[in-house]
């Protein structure tokens, strides 16, 4: 940390911490990563686990409980700069987690022969899109592991570190990720806004990011039917199955500043 600070370039010091960095015990003592003299922030594995769990069927209420636990424990500067992701070089790729069988200790020969296709692949890509919509709209900095944007698959090392598939024709996720990135760039609420949960039950997540100038509202629908969800403004919006809606309004203004609805 001292070496990073000595550069005088505004650099930050982050490390890979697999658990809640404020409650982690290691080598028989509690770690002090985020008490002001250690790390600036961390890789946000708890968010990864919560989001993947939700799109795989976990109850929205428990998912949001896990997310809010991190939001409450981390200092604001650490939370706003935590690295949010779904895949890494040390974990199974997100699409594999979502659409394929758990490895359950099976060896590399079994893992090397796995590739999800057909209906399982199609459903997996829809769930992956939902998962990235959440990752891009939660507190923290969204990170895209190479290949997720084209649905690359793979269990643990070395299968999660395969060469990029330049021949892939999978293009559906790229424009969604590009628009989510642009929305995050233009809407200050996604960078430093407070998180407020409006609904988290069953297969529906509904939350706000409240900034100084804008308020963003995010509804994610994991269910198999269209839902009509009331907005904080008093309006209603439809959210398609396996889809999400993002509404951004300027504070003190009506109508909407921006509106996104992916079907």
Explain the meaning of each model-derived region:
Residues 1, 6-82, 153-179:
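Active-site-proximal helices and loops of the catalytic beta/alpha 8
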Residues 221-263:
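C-terminal beta-sandwich/jelly-roll accessory domains of carbohydrate-active enzymes
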Residues 26-28, 84-116, 132-170:
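Aromatic/acidic polysaccharide-binding cleft in carbohydrate-active enzymes
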């Amino acid at each position: 940390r001292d070496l990073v600070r000595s550069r005088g370039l505004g650099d930050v010091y982050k490390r890979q911490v697999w658990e809640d960095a404020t409650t982690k015990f290691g080598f028989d003592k509690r770690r002090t990563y985020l008490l002001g003299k250690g790390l600036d922030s961390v890789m946000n594995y708890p968010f990864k686990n919560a989001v993947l769990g939700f799109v795989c069927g976990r109850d929205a209420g428990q998912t949001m409980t896990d997310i809010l636990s991190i939001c409450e424990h981390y200092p604001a500067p650490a939370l706003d700069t935590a690295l949010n992701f779904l895949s890494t070089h040390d974990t199974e790729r997100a699409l594999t987690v979502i659409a394929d069988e758990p490895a359950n200790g099976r060896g590399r020969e079994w893992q090397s022969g796995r590739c999800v296709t057909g209906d399982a692949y199609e459903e997996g890509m829809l769930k992956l899109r939902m998962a990235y919509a959440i990752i891009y709209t939660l507190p923290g900095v969204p990170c895209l592991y190479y290949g997720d944007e084209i649905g690359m698959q793979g269990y643990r090392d070395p299968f999660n570190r395969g060469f990029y598939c330049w021949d892939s024709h999978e293009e559906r996720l790229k424009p969604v990720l590009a628009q989510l990135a642009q929305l995050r760039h233009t809407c200050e609420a996604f960078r430093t806004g407070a998180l407020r949960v409006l609904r988290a039950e069953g297969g529906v997540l509904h939350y706000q990011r409240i900034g100084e100038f804008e308020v963003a509202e995010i509804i994610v629908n994991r269910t198999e039917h269209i839902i009509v969800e009331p907005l904080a403004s008093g309006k209603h919006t439809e959210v398609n199955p396996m889809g999400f809606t993002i509404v951004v309004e300027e504070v003190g203004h009506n109508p909407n500043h921006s509106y996104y609805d992916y079907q």
